[in-house]
Amino acid sequence: MKVPILSRLRSLSSIDRNNEEKNVDMEHQVSLDFASAPNSPTVNKSDKNNKHDKHDKSGEKAPSTPKITTTSPPSPSSSSSPSPSSSTTTSPTTTTTTLSGSDSVSKKSGKTLSPTTPTLKSTLSTSSMKSTPSGSVKNTPRQTPRQTPRQTPRGSMTPREGGSDQFESGSLSPIGETYLEGEGYEESPKSSSFFSKFISNTFSGFSMDAAPETVVTSTPRQQSRPPSAQNTPNFTSQGGSRSTSRRQSAIQL
């Protein structure tokens, strides 16, 4: 739809320019006619006056002086009074209106078409930059380095395998229970409730991340699970409690 609109605007602008040029030519001709016609009687009158002055005054030197005086006023009167009135009133108005009209058409067409492209570019750039790289780049480095130290120091791998299977099935609540039953309460039964809470939090956080294979393969689950991204700073702040719980487990073993 944009191409026919532009072609129509161009055709209209060309037609308007042709009409305006014709009008300007006609006005110039009319102004020339007005400038030539009314000046002729004035010139004739001045010549008649000069002749009368010549007849009245005697001598050769006398007619030379009135020529200078009488011929000088008609020249500014003929050039200034009729011609500028016609030329200044008609031509500048038409030229200004025509130029402004053509410029307005071109400016309007430029204004209507130009802002559409930068908006599309800006929206595409912002959406692409915000959606794809942030989701992929931020999630992968968080998952890969944190899973390796969690899995290496702990000896028993049986509850983790069960947790990964349950994570694939979709039930998140019993994972924390299996971890608490498997490691937390068996390794430190004499610990206070304060440490047991931290241990439960650490195991529940690990259950959210689960195994690397399941998390990487299930891309829609990463997008649909905001708590994993929200809980990551909490886990970083609980690093001290993790180290203490790991030391206690190592001492008990």
Curated annotation (Swiss-Prot):
One of its GO terms (biological process) is sorocarp development. It comes from Dictyostelium discoideum (Social amoeba). Residues 17-30, 45-60 have a biased composition (Basic and acidic residues). Transmembrane segments: none annotated. It comes from the Eukaryota. This is Putative uncharacterized protein DDB_G0284619. Residues 1-14, 63-104, 111-154, 236-253 have a biased composition (Low complexity). Residues 1-192, 212-253 are annotated as: Disordered. Residues 215-235 have a biased composition (Polar residues).
